[in-house]
Amino acid sequence: MLVIPAIDILDGKCVRLTKGNFDSKEVYYDNPADMAKMWQECGAKRIHVVDLDGARQGHLVNRKVIEKIVNSCSVDIEVGGGIRNKEALDYLFSIGVSYIILGSAAIYDKDLLLYSVSHYGEKTIVGIDSKKREVAVSGWLERTKIKDTELAEKIKEIGIKTIIFTDISKDGTLHGPNFEALKDMLKVGVEIIASGGISSIEDLKRLKDMGVTGAIIGKALYTGMIDLKAALLELEREGI
């Protein structure tokens, strides 16, 4: 199972939010590229990057910051937030991003989703952000009436192989992920990367036992609740 450190970018800095609330931001690092290098040195094989400004404004904002992250690391970089057109999508792959994450576009722009799948295949990931089992979009500021599993079934038919599932009510709380919702998502039959609330190695072990492909960790790393290097070593010893 992949353990994926998260870097959320707001105003060019590495921040964490709680439950997607922009007013709750905590700045952890001024230079996200240095943060990415540190996670790579700790043993991360992939890094999760979100342009929070982009998610809120509807277009990529932190392009230069993302470029610096990609140029600073040799591991896979996945990027989401504000990818709403072909130009942004093509640009990210052109600078060396390994995977892109479509969120709002998966609901509102089927053509873009189809374009990404046809041109980039399994490098296209869909992020499903759920609040009370309904999908939220636009940087979590807008809640739809679409059920999370319903969207998962639809995008599976289009050819999406991997979904990042985030329970917004858990994100940044350090209270553990929504295991019940993740069980339902796994029934769809695509690879699931869990995000939101992961706060311990025990959480990671349970996710692996469930069959989750990866786990994105944010606040637990930045607050020191999980030591990435130590966690990766322990999981490796246990064959996870």
From Swiss-Prot:
**InterPro entries xrefs:** Aldolase_TIM, His_biosynth, HisA_bact_arch, Isoase_HisA-like, Isoase_HisA-like_bact, RibuloseP-bd_barrel
- GO MF annotation terms: 1-(5-phosphoribosyl)-5-[(5-phosphoribosylamino)methylideneamino]imidazole-4-carboxamide isomerase activity
Q: In which pathway does it act?
A: Amino-acid biosynthesis; L-histidine biosynthesis; L-histidine from 5-phospho-alpha-D-ribose 1-diphosphate: step 4/9
> Where in the sequence is the active site?
8, 129
EC numbers, comma separated: 5.3.1.16
Task: List localization entries.
Answer: Cytoplasm
- Superkingdom to which the source organism belongs: Bacteria
Here the disulfide bonds are: none
User: Reaction catalysed by this chain?
Assistant: 1-(5-phospho-beta-D-ribosyl)-5-[(5-phospho-beta-D-ribosylamino)methylideneamino]imidazole-4-carboxamide = 5-[(5-phospho-1-deoxy-D-ribulos-1-ylimino)methylamino]-1-(5-phospho-beta-D-ribosyl)imidazole-4-carboxamide
Query: GO annotations under biological process?
Result: L-histidine biosynthetic process; L-tryptophan biosynthetic process
Main subcellular localisation: cytoplasm
- Write out the entry's keywords from A to Z: Amino-acid biosynthesis, Cytoplasm, Histidine biosynthesis, Isomerase
Task: Look up the record and report any one GO term of the cellular component aspect.
Answer: cytoplasm
State the family named in the UniProt similarity comment for this chain.
Answer: Belongs to the HisA/HisF family.
Spell out the protein name for this chain: 1-(5-phosphoribosyl)-5-[(5-phosphoribosylamino)methylideneamino] imidazole-4-carboxamide isomerase
Q: Which organism is it from?
A: Caldanaerobacter subterraneus subsp. tengcongensis (strain DSM 15242 / JCM 11007 / NBRC 100824 / MB4)
Q: Lineage, please?
A: Bacteria, Bacillati, Bacillota, Clostridia, Thermoanaerobacterales
